[in-house]
Amino acid sequence: MTTAKADSETSTKQRRWPLALFGAILAVIGLVLAVGGIQLAALGGSWYYILAGAALLVAGGLLAARRVAGAWLFGLTAVATVVWALAEVGLNFWMLVPRLAPFLVLAFVLALLLPQLPGVRSRRVPHLLAGVLGLGLVAGGVAVFQPHGVIQAAAAPKVQRNSATAGVGGDWQHYGRTPAGTRFAPFDQINPGNVDQLEVAWTYRTGEIADGASEFQNTPLQVDDTVFVCTPLNKVIALDAENGQERWKFDPKVEDRKTWNRCRGLGYYEPAKVEQPYAFAEDLDWQQSHPAAPGGNGTCASRIVMTTIDARLLQIDAKTGELCEDFGQNGAVDLTVGMGKVDYDNVLWYYLTSAPTVVRNMIIIGGWTFDGRSVDEPSGVIRAFSADSGELLWAWDMGQPEITKLPPEGGSYSRSTPNVWSTPAFDEELGLVYLPTGNQQPDFWGGHRPETTEKHSSAVVALDILTGRERWTYQTVHHDIWDYDIAAQPALYDIPDGKGGVTPALVQLTKRGQIFLLDRRDGRPLAEVEERPVPQTVAAGDWVAKTQPYSVGMPALGAEPLTEADMWGATFFDQLACRIAFRKLNYEGEFTAPSTKPTLLYPGYYGGFNWGSAAIDEDRGYLFLNDIRIPQVVTLIPHSEVDESKLVAGHGVGSTYPMQGTPFVIDHEAFNSPLGIPCNAPPWGVFAAVDLNTRQLVW
């Protein structure tokens, strides 16, 4: 009897310990939520976590003591959580995940353990409940891999014809396929009926290794049967489009300075196919000494144009991969001429990462400058060169507009002016090139900026192609101290005017998620723009504009202000941590000025819309775009509080910029949870279509 009784007690304890363990875990979860909830409520946040945490703490204790009341209390808390979650975020799938998924998992485990509670005589009901909850978990797991929040088109668009890029042909000779930057391939061999059957045709490996400094961001060119690619270190490779076999490789021998190695695109120039070349006095001597080869079949009859990360402009024979030595000095133009100081301790603060713009027999280039270094950085000057000789044709220096070519001997182009690091578009008929400008260095501070250059910051600027003189400017951010510079290439499109004609339009995407629709003849908005008041709090020594432009006549993507309810996590805990972090931040919307208190930027300096730009199906009048929804946190720190010798000399998130010549350095990082996941709820980007004729979001 004694042995049997002991065995029975041992068996009972073995059956009880899983419930006791579950109760203890539930109590710990409740304690953490309650403590975090107290902190959140003290910051003005939701009281839910205090109440739910306390309830789970008590329920866990009761379950550990084998009290049925613990199960009932847990169930009531779960039901209350469902009501709270639906009230806070509705039926938004991704927002419901961290609110309900943990309860679903806990409820499933509890259902399996219910038979261990006194008074629960049947296993059938608990196991049936566990089965239902288990199916819910499986369904939720499947739903994670399904699209959510999809907006579908009501009907197929009416096909129309558009002449903005007529006669471009089947090649991809420009970074955005066309001079208008439409980057849409109107081909039909790949279509919705067979896209799922595509297989890899060939693979080519460049031999370069991606590291912290290098990223492969190239959009290849395709001319006839050849694909032209450039690598982060500016190697140019010609490949057979059919089989991927290398035809030639050109290495310009740039130094890997481990900073910001990119080559986003190339230019293509074929002199014999330029029907109406521009006539420049600078080229007369060159043309007399370089008679055209019959039929354009001589050396360098077709040329690849490249800018490099050591600030050179090169031309390469598209057939052989050899330098075109009659261009510039032995095939190269030194782009540092007239720029003043550009080399700082073997780190270049000026070079080029985007594709050069080839307009007939001209090459137009801007330049990349190192973000956040100083108030004294290289110029954002725009220059045009002869595509034949490499001679400088004109320069546009917004700080010294009287300089139309090289600056006076001993001088330089205006320092730290807004640059054009992205890609322009151009309209040959109107004779205009459209520049997407950056904001003036050092990005997050503007107390020193002169009025002469302020108006060109974060703007679309139209220049006369022949002279480089400004024709019009439209600014998308006033006094930009958020790094909301224009990264996307302008896209040109002719909008039907309803009277049988068209209006030449320019579509400009911005990092703010705003889409501006402008008349490309004069910069006048074609879709309504409102100037809205914005927060006026700013660090001492700087200022903010009273209003900012909002393109209310076009859809905006990802531009809604964040709230505490938008905070996300994979679990209870990281969502709560993000809610607490959000409440601690300085945030009054997208134009909250950087301050000495950590400040939330959203949409951040990644966008909205970045340099990937948009595509336009001109026959249907559809604008295709994808946005980024990743917030950042920035903090101004007085120089006196920083050991500047230990600053992280980076270019992206997670680094500190010295901003020499200002009162502060700027620290910036991603707004992530403790698990390294963005604190805002998915989606972290969408792909969408906008009807440019109705100006409505289609899908």
What are these regions (language model features)?
Residues A425, Q548, V552-Q632, S640-E641, ...:
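Long, low-complexity segments enriched in small/aliphatic residues
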Residues G140-G169, N191-V195, Y204, V223, ...:
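N-terminal amphipathic, basic-rich helices that act as targeting or association modules
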Residues W172-G176, A213-L233, W260-R312, L348-S374, ...:
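Repeat-blade elements of multi-bladed beta-propeller folds
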Residues T2-A155:
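Topology signature of small-to-medium multi-pass alpha-helical membrane proteins
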Residues A185-V195, V200-F228, P252-K253, A281, ...:
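Asp/Glu-centered strand-loop micro-motifs enriched in Gly/Pro and often flanked by an aromatic residue
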Residues N194-G207, V236-W260, Y268-F280, L313-V347, ...:
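Extracytoplasmic/lumenal domain signature
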